[in-house]
Design a protein with these regions (language model features):
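Blade-loop segments of beta-propeller domains
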Residues: 82-118
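A short helix->beta-strand "capping" segment at the edge of beta-propeller domains
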Residues: 30-52
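Short coil/turn segments that connect the beta-strands within blades of beta-propeller domains
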Residues: 62-63, 110-111, 161-163, 208-210, ...
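Surface loop/turn motifs at the tips and blade-to-blade linkers of beta-strand repeat domains
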Residues: 46-51, 88-90, 94-99, 142-151, ...
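Beta-strand-rich domains and repeat architectures in extracellular enzymes and scaffolds
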Residues: 46-71, 102-105
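Conserved blade-ending motifs and adjacent loop-strand segments that build the rim/top face
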Residues: 232-252
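Structural motif
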Residues: 72-77, 122-130, 173-180, 219-225, ...
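Short loop/turn segments immediately following the C-termini of beta-strands
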Residues: 70, 118-120, 168-172, 216-218, ...
Length: 280
């Protein structure tokens, strides 16, 4: 994104921030009314166009956040608001010709952003897209076997210790983890049966060797999955009223505390919350 585009984006964002003040109050009020069951410890409310650009996946390189919408990628400071860079047409024409129209969950690994790409409602091309984390430029893609990945690719996650990429066999009712090697052109490595199905995973990240998965189930729960034996344990319920649970990541704050950061679309879908949750 050029300097002119950055300045223009910031100017538009500032103007819209003023315009959307009433909506910010409204959505914040709705969230406050239902906050008795919430388990977050802090939150950022993003209203209007900004919410659209933060409506699917998220990840971090440890210093900045990355967010996806169905067709865009943006990079922000860890306040989740200040845009550093953006690609508002992040699906290349080559993939659009295959029907790809949806960017899902993201995962940062070794200078790249790995993204689940889908031809939604068709499910012929489950694709892992690779983007340069510094520039957001599209770099490469890998088409997975649609007979193995049977209902799209709403999320992917790379284990930073092994370079293995994880996903599931089904977007709604998965029965196993599927593992691919990023160092060998996404060669299939193995499958790991889950102890029970984790429904509607929207995004996942590794922390201390455990795979954490954020879902859009009834309580928008976050689960912990052992990547060795597939044992599943619920970590917490987000207990959100309506809306939609989205992606997640981890960030270490200036005080040294590591927190789980998860995103959700608000009840009336004109805002997005980026919330912090305890890791332990």
């Amino acid at each position: 994104m050029s300097m002119f585009q950055i300045i223009l984006t910031k100017l538009i964002s500032t103007v819209l921030a003023v315009v959307f003040i009433p909506f910010s109050v409204l959505t914040g009020g709705i969230d406050l009314v239902t906050s008795g069951g919430h388990t977050d410890t802090a939150k950022t409310n993003i209203v209007g166009l900004g919410a659209i650009f933060r409506s699917q996946g998220m990840t971090t390189d440890g210093e900045t956040f990355y967010f996806s919408s169905k067709t865009t990628l943006i990079r922000t400071k860890t306040d989740a608001k200040t845009v550093i860079d953006a690609d508002y047409s992040a699906i290349p024409d080559e993939l659009k010709e295959l029907g790809i129209a949806h960017i899902g969950g993201l995962s940062y690994y070794d200078g790249y952003i790995y993204a689940g790409l889908e031809d939604s409602k068709v499910w012929d091309y489950p694709i892992v897209g690779v983007y340069d984390a510094e520039t957001l430029d599209f770099v490469d893609y890998y088409i997975l076997d649609c007979e193995t990945v049977t209902r799209g690719l709403p999320w992917v996650c790379v284990d930073p210790e092994t370079g293995y990429l994880y996903c599931t066999d089904h977007s709604k009712k998965p029965t196993k983890l599927l593992v691919y090697d990023t160092a060998s052109e996404m060669e299939f490595v193995k499958e790991i049966p889950l102890s029970f199905s984790v429904p509607s995973i929207q995004g996942a990240e590794f922390h201390n060797g455990t795979l954490y998965a954020a879902t859009n189930d009834e309580t928008k729960a976050i689960y912990k999955i052992n990547p060795v034996n597939g044992e599943v344990e619920k970590h917490l319920d987000r207990n959100l009223l309506g809306g939609e649970g989205e992606g997640m990541t981890f960030i270490t704050k200036e005080n040294g505390e590591t927190v789980l950061v998860a995103m959700d679309m608000g009840t009336i879908f004109i805002n997005a919350f980026v919330r912090e949750y305890p890791v332990n």
